[in-house]
Amino acid sequence: MTDLLTLEAEVRTDLGKGASRRLRHANKVPAILYGENEEPISLTLEHKNVFRAQQEEAFYSQVLTLNIAGKPVECLIKDMQRHPFKQVVMHLDFLRIDAKHAVHANAPIHFLNEDEAAKTGANISHHMNEIAITCLPKDLPEFISIDLAGLELGQTIHLSDVTFPAGVTSDELAKGEDHDLAVVSANAPKAAKVSTDDEAAAPAEEAPAAE
């Protein structure tokens, strides 16, 4: 896993759309690194390495290391542009980080024991699949687990019900009680609806005979 979160990068000076197209034709990915009040740096990475790394969930939530001219730089992935129908990464945005400064990130949610919750006959509705968090880089979780084993019909788990790892806080909860958003709920199944065709097929009551 550590190897996948470390990528070799080269500084590029040939900029513009034409230069980016040439890079992609050479199986490379244009990128930019910014943040921490330093000048942005335009970079180039090998597509095969990026594509392999981005298949891992941790790529989107953990600290990455870019080796730039032999110097390691820690960062987070902030944006990734993909080709609309090809398996091609078009561009990457990296945010430079400092170990002493808190970062904002999105932690994916892993829902545990969902089958147990569904045994109640409930429809399990996911209201979010990731949670916006703030923490120091060393405290970044790869994911946040939510156990649904005790979730009963009609219940909802909110952000305030989630157990966050030490040093990690919810961005929404930090805004106040009005931002205690629903994360997942167990809803009663909708009653089966009789179709119009079924109603039409039902035998009509016989009208009383005229006297």
UniProtKB/Swiss-Prot annotation:
Q: Which GO terms describe its biological process?
A: translation
Please give the Pfam families that the UniProt record associates with this protein: Ribosomal_L25p (PF01386), Ribosomal_TL5_C (PF14693)
Q: Which domain of life is it from?
A: Bacteria
Record-level GO cellular component terms = cytosolic large ribosomal subunit
Regions of compositional bias (Low complexity) in chain numbering = 201-211
Provide the GO MF annotations for this entry: 5S rRNA binding; structural constituent of ribosome
Keywords assigned: Ribonucleoprotein, Ribosomal protein, RNA-binding, rRNA-binding
Keyword rRNA-binding part of the UniProt annotation? yes
> Which segments carry the region annotation Disordered?
188-211
Keyword Ribonucleoprotein set for record: yes
Q: Which SUPFAM superfamilies match?
A: Ribosomal protein L25-like
Q: Which family does it belong to?
A: Belongs to the bacterial ribosomal protein bL25 family. CTC subfamily.
**Physiological role:** This is one of the proteins that binds to the 5S RNA in the ribosome where it forms part of the central protuberance.
Q: How does it assemble?
A: Part of the 50S ribosomal subunit; part of the 5S rRNA/L5/L18/L25 subcomplex. Contacts the 5S rRNA. Binds to the 5S rRNA independently of L5 and L18.
In terms of NCBIfam families, this protein maps to: bL25_bact_ctc (TIGR00731), PRK05618.1-2 (NF004128), PRK05618.1-5 (NF004130), PRK05943.1 (NF004612)
Q: What HAMAP family is this protein classified in?
A: Ribosomal_bL25, Ribosomal_bL25_CTC
Entry protein name: Large ribosomal subunit protein bL25
Q: Specify the species.
A: Colwellia psychrerythraea (strain 34H / ATCC BAA-681)
